[in-house]
């Protein structure tokens, strides 16, 4: 497989693909194609087919050279990874041998000022991973103070969320907040940080990004979709980058890897048979060398599991946190 251009090294890529254990003739799904790092490693590990999904059309366009160099073994699909099962069915692969997911924003997106993800690069306050739906500027312009506070607290775990929300409401009365620098400067007036600590706007930007892209809902649905498409013995590998994501993955795999017993009085409460066997009792983390080469790897956690022959469980109900549709509807 030959290809020009710099090679992207995915976080915990070797470890994630090692968990998948690709084999000749297998079909694998990269739910978050990005720069194609995991896909390349899977294609190089064995004579496999890969279906790669990304909601960012720029990532899909940038992957064209890789498609050309892999002689029909790679299919790129512009879609959300929550639609993974439908994508596989459309590609004639109703069951697959492995699924890998790298959750959150990509380094390419963060490094592009015009995507509006970074408080360090001034650009339009966008933050969308795809090309549709409300932007972060729309949310900041229309959400109520209470909704903003909840969003920033729940998705950013920012203890000063009410102060930040109040400052945003006050600032937008004077002028629209449409750039990343404008928002970062507003947050910095109420959230202080000492030298060596994270930037004051870190948690607020994380919260808005997660909210705008409905990332946690997407993750819930993608995990459930992977459960449905993986064949017995198929493997799931998920790399997450903060506690909210990791908690969802850990809980999902934990719930689906144990059998809860009912009582003789309520035998109907017996849970479904385990649909996964957990392969990582503790998450795999990056070593010192990888962290030195890529500081983003410091917070990464990799969890893996193998599909059993049991039927997929009923999809979980989504938590009752604020939704993009409800907040935007209330703010109009």
UniProtKB/Swiss-Prot annotation:
Location relative to the cell: Cytoplasm
GO MF assignments: rRNA (cytosine-N4-)-methyltransferase activity
Keyword set, alphabetical order: Cytoplasm, Methyltransferase, rRNA processing, S-adenosyl-L-methionine, Transferase
Domain of life of the source: Bacteria
GO terms under cellular component: cytoplasm
Residue span of region Disordered: 296-322
Catalytic activity line of the entry: cytidine(1402) in 16S rRNA + S-adenosyl-L-methionine = N(4)-methylcytidine(1402) in 16S rRNA + S-adenosyl-L-homocysteine + H(+)
Recorded coiled-coil stretches: none
InterPro entries for this protein: RsmH, SAM-dep_MeTrfase_MraW_recog, SAM-dependent_MTases_sf
GO terms for biological process, alphabetical: rRNA base methylation
Transmembrane segments: none
EC numbers on record: 2.1.1.199
Residues at which S-adenosyl-L-methionine binds: 36-38, 54, 81, 102, 109
Chief location of this protein within or outside the cell: cytoplasm
Family: Belongs to the methyltransferase superfamily. RsmH family.
Function as written in the Swiss-Prot or TrEMBL entry: Specifically methylates the N4 position of cytidine in position 1402 (C1402) of 16S rRNA.
Protein name per the record: Ribosomal RNA small subunit methyltransferase H
Organism: Rhodopseudomonas palustris (strain BisB5)
